[in-house]
Design a protein with these regions (language model features):
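TerminUS-proximal long segments
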Residues: 55-123
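Glycine- and acidic-residue-biased ligand/ion/polar-headgroup-sensing regions
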Residues: 9-21, 29-63, 67-71
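Anionic coordination/interaction segments
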Residues: 1-32, 106-122
């Protein structure tokens, strides 16, 4: 997990908080989001409010799941959108678990079925 966002830790999971903040900033910098994989943890994000730097097409109340080992981020266009930005107003909570999560029947009912396509370039 990204340690700069980590707020709580147990032997089974960590909780990360994405809060409004300034980026590491320099006038000639581009605070670009980055690709990553959670090699040894499943990641669940709950989006509370604001614009998430690495994502597009989400809103308050959205939940995403990235199983261990699956590369993700950033969405197409987010590099370009980061140019000139000095901060973010994002608000989200992330849990990274060190054992695989099991998707419940209730979670399957709210799956939009197209999340995996959101990482592809739109033509």
């Amino acid at each position: 997990p990204p340690p700069v966002h980590q707020t709580f830790e147990t032997g089974a999971f960590v909780v990360c908080s994405f809060c409004p903040r300034l980026y590491d900033y320099h006038p000639k910098s581009i605070p670009a989001p980055y690709n990553h994989s959670n090699i040894d943890s499943d990641e669940v994000l709950y989006y509370v409010d604001g614009d998430f730097m690495s994502r597009t097409g989400i809103g308050p109340g959205y939940i995403s799941l990235h199983p261990a080992g699956i590369p993700h981020g950033p969405h197409p266009g987010t590099y370009e959108a980061s140019i000139g930005k000095k901060g973010t107003e994002e608000l989200a909570v992330m849990i990274d678990t060190f054992k695989p999560l099991q998707v419940t029947e209730n979670a399957l009912k709210i799956d939009d079925g197209k999340y995996y396509k959101s990482w592809l370039e739109q033509n």
